[in-house]
Amino acid sequence: MEQVDLAIIGGGISGVAVAQCAAAAGYSVVLLEKSTLAAGTSSQSSKLIHGGLRYLESGQLDLVRESLRARRELLRLAPTLVKAVPFFIPVYRDSRRGALTLRAGLSLYGLLSEFDRLGRFRSLPARAWGSFPGLKLAGMTHMFQYWDAQTDDALLTKAVADSARLLGADIREGAECLTIEHEPQGCKLSYRDADGDKMLHCRFLVNAAGAFVNELLARVTPPIAQTAIDWVQGSHLLLDIPAPPGVLYLESCFDERVVFVMPWYGKTLIGTTETLCQGPVPQITREEIAYLLGIYRHYFGGSGSFTGAVTTEALEAKVLAHFSGMRVLPKGDGDAFGRPREVQLYQRYSHPRLLTLYGGKLTTFRATAKAVTAEISKVLGKRSPKADVDKLMLG
């Protein structure tokens, strides 16, 4: 039977990042992905590398600080994949978040970024408010501009996987884990690929299956306790409208949430929603489409991309594509808006050779991978490192 130090289940950004970090630390690594790399949420996110300005409202300062540090690192390590982008926040007379609140929030955002090169913001003069064609100017009192970053999430995931491969990690696509037998010295896995059923023994196993994390735990013997989760779907629409000159940070006209209008390969991308779902497979709903188009129409009711007033039918005709990513959040009451977004690492006393990742953010994947690798080293001991992940360029 094949023997390795570490097996990872899941080929999203978290899984490939753990593969890279662990391989750099000197461990032998096999990653099993039942489909293709970045087939799930890691290709269906909002494409942003950002601190999460809105998380300040729920007091998640540590998460914002960590995310801003991660943003700085990725701009350095992946300059061809992660690009600084201007963000714009229009403020209207009826906005829930007034100019003073936003100025305070942006000041704190800059402080938490340690005033790096993207940590500054400014209030734009009224003559600059028309830089977004068709954006509603009636009732606007301020427009703030700050900086964050954008990426192609699928390409970034594949770049991390390529780096892991160069370090010796064996990444296998089309390989579905079927059973997991936890033993005192590791885990015995059965999996299926194009050549049939196979077996693998690892000294440590990381469950990075994303939305399917508990489904994978159900295949473990002896049985292991699962953490209660909610599946929260984030949907996006790609519109056949010329890309805006930056990212617009807009208050929803329907609730307290924030929605982004973003440039994406020359077109306009709008998202995201937060819809509680009953299962791990995302599927955009008519309500989500109406929600996103309604917000766009509220702010761009006289867009220069249309003749006359913007109707719902005209906007629907502009939809080129849609996609939905699935988040895993701690189970709770009410909507998902204020729930914690930090990744959770679970390692049960009954199953010390198995670590499960719940949640995670695209921006902070490197910090997650380092934390997981530190847990691996506590069980397996340290190896002679092959590389310093803080110096490995991506892309």
Regions found by a protein language model. Name each.
Residues W129-L167, K188, T273-P280, P352-G359:
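Helix-loop-beta segment of a Rossmann-like dinucleotide-binding subdomain
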Residues K47-P133:
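Dinucleotide-binding Rossmann-like beta1-alpha1 core, especially the glycine-rich loop
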Residues L155, S163, T221-P244, Y249-I270, ...:
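C-terminal catalytic lobe of FAD-dependent flavoproteins
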Residues E2-V4, D195-F204:
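Core beta-strand elements of the Rossmann-like FAD/NAD(P) dinucleotide-binding domain
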Residues E173-C187:
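A conserved short coil-to-beta-strand element within the FAD-binding core of flavoproteins
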Residues M1-S14:
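Beta1/beta-strand and adjacent pyrophosphate-binding region of the FAD-binding site
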Residues N207-P222:
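Flavin (primarily FAD) binding-site architecture
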